[in-house]
């Protein structure tokens, strides 16, 4: 273990101080948003606040704190001992990025999210359906403010997704402007951000059975 000399003997900074030091170096004495899991609320984040304010002589540390709830796997808490850890590299190899984004946005960040096959399948079917109203749009096409309102309300992603469903229904029966609004609202959160052809290629590639699985 690395250590340094001190008046009290050899020692090293604890993890609370490590985070305060990194925040000060890269973000400054005060910054806007600090995130982390709900399990870090106490004692880690409270210690960060106390020592950073004292060291920097400031009244605040971070202006806003966003604590996310846990992701479970089939209603079980993720744990290495259980062998049910969700690795990002595995997701990238098996799940299209759009499906992954929609799945993660399906619950508010403060609420637990259960990761299971049904969630992924439902999100894949939703994306597939939404591509029925896909339209190439200009990059500077703006999303109407009223559509964005849920995101202003403590990042209410389920509320925003509900708006996307309403926009899809309108786009399906409407004109090109309705479709453009729908697509721009989807692309604002990283959905429908590839061409319809690319999405179809992804579907086909996932539908093919590898030869080694046949033999």
Predicted stretch roles:
Residues 77-215:
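Structural preference for alpha-helix termini/caps and helix-kink/transition segments
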Residues 1-139:
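Alpha-helical recognition segments enriched in aromatics with Gly/Pro capping
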């Amino acid at each position: 273990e690395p250590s340094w000399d001190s008046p009290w003997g050899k020692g090293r900074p604890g993890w609370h101080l490590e985070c305060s030091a990194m925040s000060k170096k890269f973000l400054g004495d005060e910054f806007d948003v600090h995130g982390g899991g709900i399990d870090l609320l106490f004692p880690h984040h409270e210690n960060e606040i106390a020592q950073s304010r004292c060291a920097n002589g400031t009244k605040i540390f971070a202006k806003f704190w966003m604590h996310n709830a846990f992701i479970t796997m089939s209603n079980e808490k993720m744990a290495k001992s259980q062998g049910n850890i969700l690795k990002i590299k595995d997701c990238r190899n098996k799940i299209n990025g759009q499906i992954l984004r929609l799945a993660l946005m399906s619950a508010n960040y403060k609420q637990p999210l259960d990761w299971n096959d049904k969630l992924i399948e439902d999100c894949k079917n939703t994306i597939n359906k939404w591509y029925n109203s896909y339209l190439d749009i200009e990059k500077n096409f703006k999303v109407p403010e009223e559509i964005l309102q849920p995101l202003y309300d403590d990042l209410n992603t389920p509320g925003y997704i509900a708006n996307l469903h309403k926009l899809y229904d309108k786009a399906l029966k409407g004109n090109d402007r309705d479709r453009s609004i729908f697509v721009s609202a989807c692309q604002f959160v990283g959905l429908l951000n590839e061409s319809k052809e690319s999405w179809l290629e992804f579907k086909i590639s996932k539908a093919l059975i590898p030869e080694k699985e046949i033999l």
